[in-house]
UniProtKB/Swiss-Prot annotation:
The chain crosses the membrane at residues 9-25, 81-101. Gene3D superfamilies: alpha/beta hydrolase. This is Uncharacterized membrane protein YNL320W. One of its GO terms (cellular component) is mitochondrial membrane. To S.pombe bem46 and M.tuberculosis Rv2307c. The lineage of its organism: Eukaryota, Fungi, Dikarya, Ascomycota, Saccharomycotina.
Amino acid sequence: MLWKVSKMFLGGLVALTTISVATLYHYQNRLVYPSWAQGARNHVDTPDSRGIPYEKLTLITQDHIKLEAWDIKNENSTSTVLILCPNAGNIGYFILIIDIFYRQFGMSVFIYSYRGYGNSEGSPSEKGLKLDADCVISHLSTDSFHSKRKLVLYGRSLGGANALYIASKFRDLCDGVILENTFLSIRKVIPYIFPLLKRFTLLCHEIWNSEGLMGSCSSETPFLFLSGLKDEIVPPFHMRKLYETCPSSNKKIFEFPLGSHNDTIIQDGYWDIIRDFLIEKGFI
């Protein structure tokens, strides 16, 4: 009897693992990029809901995908912040953050929806999002307004991985980088989100090797690392290792004892730290 129960248990465990592995391989893009969650593809709030003047742009990538972007110019600014979003929601979720950078810090702001997010065309993938980033940097570097200003990257979670891709590939165009709760790689996050799949991480084709890209960033670019120590998705040691790996001679890390993955941004002192960084490095 005990043997039969054990066989049933083992059979169920094998079946569960097989299903989980198949899900990881075939549906990982929907897991990594939940652009559909909470109706984020159906409605996108706009900056005019807070009285922020903006220009809506359509950028076309190398593979002919149309991206929605918002250009918020501040004529008195000396810097532009490029906001790089996490993997859920849409750019409408960032209006309050736009407001802080634009009104409180006096910066120009540029933000765009990745392919497959918000009102942008296409389906998200690592390869595709990197083409999106190439397109945006090409636009900013040739734009008559933004090309005259310093460029600061602000990336949260997946947005941080995107920021590191940009900072490593376009190191001469990036003047500062702010990272929040960013991972070493997707493969190194899987064991913490899906423990049963820790032996199958090589099946993950969405890699985002932030750890590997960090070494290609400029040693002269200022970096600010913001880490929530109660992050339940990205283990805090990922941020600590990114900080330690960062070649910049001008880097700082701040850790928030009560910050989880999504609420580090509202922890006491978060925006004061960012303001001080921007002032100290001459961005505002």
